[in-house]
Amino acid sequence: MLNMVGSVLASGKNESFKLQYRVVAQDSLASAMMLGLANEDTAFIFDKVENNKKKTASGRPTWASLVQLSDYSVRGIDATTNPFCAAGTTLGNGSYIVVGGNSAISYGGINVKNSDGSMNLNGPAPPYNDMDGRRVVRMMQPNADSSKLKWIDDFDSPNQMDSPRWYPAIEGLADGSVVMIGGATSGGFINRNYPNVDPVYATSSSNPKAGVWDQGGANPVSYTHLRAHET
């Protein structure tokens, strides 16, 4: 983990301000796919599901951690669903919200199969025991006590989104709620070598809808189709 610090370099009568990085922690326990401020003394890190060495209390690899900015100590916290390529922002009440992500995965980011040969997209998927994150709305509520900071991350929550979103966009609104826009229905990249005959739905792999989440935690509402334009 790096911290940017400023130093004043004297050169004759002129002084210049130089920014430089210094290492403050050798191991953040998880890669910072997402990084934010949870309170005045704590930063949160959110990674995709992968086989990080440090395990949490649940036995899963750590893909979420907290960093104390006073001494740069790091501790892992539990997360349940796969937030790979999710979107996040701050609600008007100070909570941090992370929506969408990828399906449950195994080694190498691949999906596993059920005993009947069907794909196990929901999870839990061995060896990480992760759950599908594509419809999940995760929340970290503000708390001055860093020991009480945690992710509300429930695969089967009644407050999940109405449809799956991988790589969506999210934007805060003036009333403190957020709008969630678009995304794909599952993770992955398709480099087409043929015309896109379905620019709106991309033959079921696109989610051309917008949804609104209010800061009280109501289920996403006001879904409308978006127009997709291609040249």
Residue ranges: model-predicted function:
Residues 16-24, 71-80, 140-161, 202-223:
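Blade-edge beta-strand/turn elements of extracellular beta-propeller
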Residues 24-59, 84-86:
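Beta-strand-rich domains and repeat architectures in extracellular enzymes and scaffolds
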Residues 38-40, 91-93, 172-175:
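Residue-level detector of Asp-centered blade-edge/turn motifs that repeat once per structural unit
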Residues 41-76, 109-117, 129:
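Beta-propeller domains
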Residues 62-68, 132-144, 194-210:
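Beta-propeller blade signature
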Residues 71-109, 114-123:
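Blade-loop segments of beta-propeller domains
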Residues 224-231:
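Conserved small/polar residues in nucleotide/adenosyl-binding loops
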